[in-house]
């Protein structure tokens, strides 16, 4: 998903302290929580470990290795204007980021653009659905009127999930669809 960062300076509902336990369909315990600056290592590992297809679906091109600048941008966020929730999984004593969902808020328009990424080995676990339900709830609590995302037209998993959650699907540009949910 492509994201354009809006320039906002209002609406201060704090999402920076979100934390919730969640269990995947196959019984894995995952902690959903607000991303923090000290998550750079696990965010980089998530991005660097993506399959070509997952990288393309999230970034609209393949990223073989996340740069320090990119990871900093993703982890050092302003919760007045953004929401970023990661899925932390403890695998054999090692903390791993297995997904992230983001919402960039345009308070003036009362809307937000989202992006979602689920690690390949956590796809089809229910995490994408949980992420989107959480983001929708947070958007409503922020008083947003809608959320939307740009999706590659061949990203059938996300398009199917969006339809199941009530998003409308429209055409954006060549090879892309825009999915929108009125809140």
Roles of regions detected by a PLM:
Residues 1-183:
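Long, contiguous binding/interaction regions
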């Amino acid at each position: 998903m492509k994201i354009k960062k809006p320039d906002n300076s209002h609406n201060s509902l704090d999402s920076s302290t979100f934390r919730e336990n969640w269990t995947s369909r196959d019984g894995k315990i995952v902690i959903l929580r607000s991303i923090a600056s000290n998550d750079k290592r696990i965010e980089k590992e998530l991005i660097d470990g993506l399959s070509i297809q997952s990288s393309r679906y999230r970034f609209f091109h393949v990223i073989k290795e996340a740069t320090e600048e990119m990871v900093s941008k993703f982890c050092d966020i302003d919760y007045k204007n953004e929401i970023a929730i990661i899925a932390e999984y403890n695998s054999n004593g090692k903390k791993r980021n297995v997904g992230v969902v983001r919402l960039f808020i345009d308070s003036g328009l009362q809307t937000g653009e989202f992006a979602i990424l689920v690690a390949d080995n956590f796809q089809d676990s229910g995490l994408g659905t949980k992420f989107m339900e959480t983001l929708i709830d947070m958007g409503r609590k922020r008083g947003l009127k809608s959320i939307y995302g740009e999706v590659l037209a061949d990203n059938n998993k996300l398009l199917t999930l969006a339809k199941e959650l009530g998003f409308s699907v429209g055409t954006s540009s060549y090879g892309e669809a825009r999915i929108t949910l009125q809140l």
